[in-house]
Structures are given as C-alpha cells and as structure tokens.
Amino acid sequence: MENINIEYGIDSNLNLDKFQDNEMEIKNLSKSFDNNNNNNSNTNNIKNNNRERSRRKSLSMPLLEPLPKPKRPPVPPRAFLMNDGADEKITNYIPTTPPSINITFEKKEDGDNYDDNYDDNYSGEDIKTSTTPPQFNSPEFNKNKPLPPIPIDQEKEDYHTMAPKPLPRVPSKIETFNDQNNNEGLQNSTSPLSSSPPPLGNLLNTSNGWRSANKPIDSSFSNIAPKRSTTLFDVTNPTIFPSSLNSSGSCCSSSGSGGKSPSNFLNFEPSKPNFENFDDYVFGNDSSELSQSQISPVVRTRRQRVFTRKAATMKLLDNGVDTDDENESELSKKSGTTLDSEPNLKSVSSSNRGSFVISKSSYNLRGSCSDEDDQENQTTNKNNSNNNNNNTTTNNNNNNNNNNNNNKDTLKVTETKHGRTVSLPEEPVSTLIPNATVSKKRPSLFNKFDFKSVIFEKIEEQQQKFESIPSRRSQLPYINDSTIFNKVVKEIIETEADYLDHMEITINFYLFAALEMVKYKILEKRDIFSIFSNFEEVYHISLKIYPMLLNCIPLLEKNQYPNIEEVFLFNSKSFQRYGSYLSSHDSCNKFLQEILLTNQTAAQIFQKLIPICKLNNLHSFLIKPCQRLCKYPLLLKELSKALPKEDEQNHKTIKRTTSLMGKIVSDINGKMKNDTKIQEIIKEIGTKDIEYLLHHQTFIGEGKVKKVNKNGSTSEGTLYLFNQRIVFAEKNSLFNKKATVISLSNISRVCDYDYRYPSGFAIYHNSKKVSTSSSSNLGTLSLGALIIISDEKLKWMNKIEDQIVSERVLAGTYTYVTNHFESFKNLENCSFSQSDSQSDFVDHDIQQEQQEQQQQQQEEEQTRVKIPQIVEPLSQQHDQPKLDHQQSSIQPKLSFPHLKQPKQDEKPIKKPKSPKHKNTEPENFSFY
C-alpha cells in the first residue's frame, strides 16, 4: 500500500523534492548543534540525543494504520483555552513550532516510538537573529546553577534518568509556509484524497504526531492524555511549562518591550532573541489578528476534559477583574474568566509557552493518579527545585476595587499583547478538612485602639478640673491658738482637712483611672472592690464629721471650751464601718501588688498618676484611713490633758469619748485578729464546708479535749467555741480529718457527766447535727449528746452556758421567768417604780386558764335547769386575795416546752425517785 505522512495531511503527489531538500538541511543543521550540551554533566543527554535522531527517522507511517503503543505515556499539551467554560466549544490548541518534515514511502523502521517531547520542549526562539540560541538546560543558561547531588541510596544511572531532557536542536533556516505559498505549491499537484489541502496553520499536534484538523479520525486513533499526579509544585519552571497565551489561542512572547509583561516579574532574564514576529514567521500572519473562523476545532482530549471540569468546579464567572494596567483590565473583561478564591492572591506568570501557570494552591480534581505519574512528577520537582526557587514570581494585586464592587476576591486572568497573567490564591492554611477555606480574622478596631492614650487624656482633663479647686486647709478661717486646748483643736481640724483632700485625690484619680480601665476591659468590675474595698464609704464618714468640727471654731475665738468630744460620740456608730475596711486592707494590698506585676497596662497607668498625686502611689493613699482611725484616740487624750482640772464635767465627757474611740479601735483590731485566727482554724481543720460554717464567726476559745465515742472509746481532738457554734475537730490521720459542728441555738442543756467520767460533761441537743468531713458532707441526728472530757470542765461549761444565753437574747428567743416584760418591749424606758414592784402580778397562763374555766361554767349554767343554788357562784370561787410579791407562790414558767406546768389548784405531780447520781441520761439519745 502506498504510504503517506498523515500527520501533515499531505498527499503523495505533492512536490516532495522540495520537502526532502528542506529535511536534509535540517538534518545537517542538527549535527552542527551537537556541541550545545557537551558541557552538561548529565550523561542522560547523550542518550536523549540518540533517541531524538531515531525518532526523526521514524516519522512516516502507513496510511490509516495506527502507530504502535509508546513505551511511556506521552506528555500532554501544556495549556488549553476554554470558551466561557462551555464543554462543547473548545478553542484550538495552536502548536508553537513547525514540525520537521520527513516523507518516505518505506515501511517504518524499528526503534523508539515517537512522542511529542520534541514539540513540547521546543523553545520557539527566533531563528533569524541567532542560529545558536541558549538552551534552558545548557551551561550558558544554567550558569552557577549546578544539578542537585546524587542521593546516596540511588545509583548513578537511575538518578540521571530523572534529569530533564535536553532540548532538541533548533534549525537555523526554515522556509516560511503561509497560505499563499501553500496554495501555490499545492495547486499544481493532484491528490486522490484532497484537491485543496488545508494550510499549515490548521495542522494539529496530537500525542501520536501531527495531523490535519479536517481529516476524519480513525476509530483506533486515541488522544488520551496521561493522568497527572496530585503533587503540588511551587511556581512552574520555564523549562517545564510554556508561557501564557493570547486571546486568539496562539503562543505569545513574554519578553516584549512596553507594558507590564509577565516576564518582568521573573527573578531571571535569560538572554534570548526577539520573538515578536515568530507567529507571523510560522503562520504567515500575526497570531493576535487570527480570527476564530480561521482556527479549526480540536478534538477534545481527556486532559482537556480535566481542565474543563476543574474550571467548572472553581465557579468560573463572566465578570472581569481589575489589574494594574488599564489595557490589561480591558482584555480581562473580554476574556471573562474569574474564579472565587481567597482574599490574598498571588499573580504568577511563567516565561515559557503554551500553558497556564499552576501554583501551590491549585487543586487536582481528578481524585486518583497512578504511581508512575507520581514518580514522574516527583522527578520533575526534584530536578527543577533550584529553578523553581529562583523563578518564583509574585504580584501583590490591590483588592480594594474587588472588595468594593463584588465583595469577593476572584482569580485574575489578564490578557495583554505580551501574554496572559493568571492570579491564583495564596497557599491555604493547613486544615483537617482538605481544600477547606480558612477565614482570616481582620484585626478589629478595638484591638488597634490605643487605650492608654485615651485614659491619659481623660486623666489630664481631670487634673485640670482638680487644680482649679483650692485645698480645704487654705479655706479654713483663722483659729486662735493662744492656749494649748486651742492648739489641739486646731490640729484636729487641719489634719481632718488634709485627710479629706488625700481621699479626694484617691477617688478623683486612682479610682477614676481604675473605672476607665474597666470600660476598656483592662480590669474587671470585681477588681475595683478587691483594691479599694469600701473606701468611698469611709470618705463620706469624714465628709460628715468635718463641718461639725468647723462649728467649734467660733467658740475658740471666745476662749471657750467647745464640746468637740460630742462630735465623736454622735458618730460612734459610723466609725464602726472602718472595721470592714481595716480587716480587708491586707488582702487589698496583696491583690494590688499582684495586679501591678501581672497587668502591664494597669501598672503603666498607675505609674503615670504618681507625679499628679503629690508623688504618692496608691499604696500610700489606701493606708491613710487606718492611720486616721488610730490617731483619733491619741488626739482626744491630748485634748483631755489640755483641759484645766477645774472643769470636771468636760473632763468626764472627754474621758468617755476617749475610751469609746479606744474601744472602737480595739474592736476593729480584735476583729482583724479574729479573722486571722479563723483563717488559721479553717486551714487546720481543712474540711469541705468548714469555711462556710465559720463565716462571720467570732472566736471565743479553744482547748485540747477528749470525746467519748459510741463504743466507749475516746478520741483526742480540739474543741473550738465561737459566738454561734461549737466545733470539735479530730484528726485520725494525715488525710482523714473530721469535724463536728453544733449550733448553740440547738443545744438543750449542758450538764455534768461525772457518774462515768469524773472530768466529763455532756452537751445535749435536740436538732440536726451538722457534721463535715473530707469524705462526707452533712449528717442528721434527731437527738444526740457530745461527751467531752477535760480538766477544765467547769470553765468550759460556764463559757458554753453564757454564750448560749447571750446568743438567745440577741436572737430574741430567750424565755424569761415571767412574761410581764413583754408589755415593756416597745417602751424606751424599762425602769419600774416601787408601787409597781409591790403590786400583785399574776402569771399570764394562770389568768388564761381561769378565763377558760369561767366560760365553760357559764355555758353549762345556760343549758342547765334553774335549781336553787347549792354551790357558791363561780365568781366567789375564783376570787383571789391580793398577795404581796414576797408571799406570792406563783410557779415560774420553765424554759423547756415539753414539760407541763402544774396548775395552782392541782396537786403537784410526784417525780420518780432519782438514782444515786445527780444527772440522768435522756431515754433516746446517741453519742457522736
């Protein structure tokens, strides 16, 4: 059968001599380029050169006979243009270089199968300007860029197979083929297949060679591209990928002058000839002016389908994207290819031809790949790691217009006369979900706001207001200090004025700054009380006392003795509010010190206030109320010494005032000591609920005692007495702690227990027993007894009984012997005259019983038949003579409600004989 080269779509009747002469020239020129790669250290270049020669010899194939299966998968085309994301209409893939022509009528020789490495790796450089252009893998181009070292675990031959292949030789002269030349050369020939062959511009490059776009495709012909690996590489190497494409689908130069070419962003500028007229040289006209009708449709390969699906999943939009150049923005609107992406974008462009640039963040949507493809892509990445690092290009695009117009950041595809720039998103943040979009939080205005400067400005405004107010001491009138008494009074008034001024400084600056810090969340609300406690309350107490002291000044001018002690007597209850401040002063200082160490912003603000506040820090102002309260008794003592001895009445009042103020101070100090002691007891007991149960308790006494258990054994422990509770704490081991807590209001009686233990006493109670331990919380018991053995038995019994009585009196549950005091509860004066004491008082219960008996008898008389009265009237029966208080035998009301009181007329119930011992145990009780 007659053979013909179907890749070119040329018949056998063509002028073959012309093509054969051109091919011979190309072969001769290719031999002259053998020295291009001699300096390359890769031994694989020699193998590749031999392989290329064998491939050129086997370019012909029999008509309608498919090529044999290649040994390795062919390299797919590097880029495709998509028409608005449509699947049916796909723009042609235009080859970047004219093929070498070899037409024979012989059968194909054995050898390596042809693939498209020659066409893909062809650099497309201008042949007119330079006959020996630099190759990308030649020493001239890769100067000071050695190949990566050979790994230890890999042999030298295996490793060099991974190196990039050398580019084929570029012919120095190729005859131009345009439409006119093709028509003239082909009109004279007669072809059995086609009388008017297509121009060379319609020739298409496939994985099996070059063929005509107008020819029908054989059923055995396959355009299946190999699978791509999911390996993500950095910015593509110009030796791997061709450069960007123009709007017509043909390759364009990336090294032209004028405008912002994508190649200007590259880190290197290789020396190569001008390529502006390359498309015109090959096709006979400018590729940018090539219309869509002149480009024949291309059969869609599998690789093209992958790109189409990928573009569809990335949601291609029809709106344009703004770029730095106005011309580029207009072309991008025409292209209408945008992708939703993350806000920050990288604009990258390669210096090679024929493909888009795939960056790190590009996604592989195929989902599966073969091991061979993985190894192939890994090899490419290893060999080109140096070039990838040097050839990375970034372009930081302004996204303000995108944010204002679309509120979305899209992938940017920009076309210019120099090429196409594709902007892909940056490297995504690693997430658990693959391909997840991570939203980057922008710093809010609250975080950028300078709070310290705002607070400082407010403090300066506060300072200006405070400076306009004069001090209190400067406003005081003249005080006569001719006598010692007047000098002491003057000192009291002046020191009180200074004390008030210092407290106002603390409130107007330190407390003001702390409240401002709470607004900006530098401090919390609870921190204010932890630092200042009830400082404002103490300030208002002094603010109330100061005008009272000023009223004493007119009397000093008359050399009279003012009753200044009455000011302190009148405000004695107010001074007790100092107790809560003094008791919390130590904890406030510790908390303030912790804030200054941990919170740097608060420390800087407080430090800024020291020059404004008379060079005193916050610690020195917070201790002034404690110092002032302790100074009041000392000033009153000096005042009593200054009084003359003849004025006995004023001496008595001043002494009473001094003792009262001293008692207030001692109570406050005692409260502080009491709080310290309670904290020590809580730490010593160390059970769960003990801190809650001892809250606001006053410590009275403690001692080492023994407790009698249920089985008769004894256990040692400590007995604590408080104003409302009794606590017995025992410690069995280091971690086994137990405490028994009994409320004084629930204790029925305290009695001796010497019939069994000579030094023992029992505490009986008829209510719930509160027991707390490290393992259990609370327990209940209907009736119980706590048997205590102590050498100081009488002392403990008296203390407990006195505390029980005082607690019941304060609680209003104490039961008096007679109830005639109830009528005087609401009276201010409870004194009785002699006549009242001599009058006869009848118990209220007895009167009530008598009234009930009279009512019953009256009801019986009304129901009864009238008969002569045999008995005396009821009124005569119950008439009682008046008795003196000395002769009255009224039974007192017992404090125990479960015991009945005998009536007056009834005989007293005989009590059973008591055993030999004095006290008996209740019938139902249990020991702890």
Curated annotation (Swiss-Prot):
Ranges for region PH-like: 699-807
Stretches the record annotates as Disordered: 30-76, 90-201, 318-410, 835-928
UniProtKB keywords: Guanine-nucleotide releasing factor
Keyword Transmembrane: no
Domain notes: The PH-like region is similar to the PH domain but is not detected by Pfam and PROSITE prediction tools. It is unclear whether it is a real PH domain.
SMART domains linked to this entry: RhoGEF
Domain DH: start-end pairs: 484-671
Cited function: GTPase-activating protein.
Name of the protein this chain belongs to: RhoGEF domain-containing protein gxcH
Domain of life: Eukaryota
PANTHER family: FACIOGENITAL DYSPLASIA PROTEIN (PTHR12673), RHOGEF DOMAIN-CONTAINING PROTEIN GXCH (PTHR12673:SF254)
A GO CC term attached to the entry: cytoplasm
Compositionally biased region (Polar residues): 93-103, 129-141, 175-187, 334-367
GO molecular function: guanyl-nucleotide exchange factor activity
Compositional bias per record (Acidic residues), positions renumbered to this chain: 112-123
Pfam family, one: RhoGEF
Comp. bias regions, Low complexity: 30-48, 377-407, 848-857
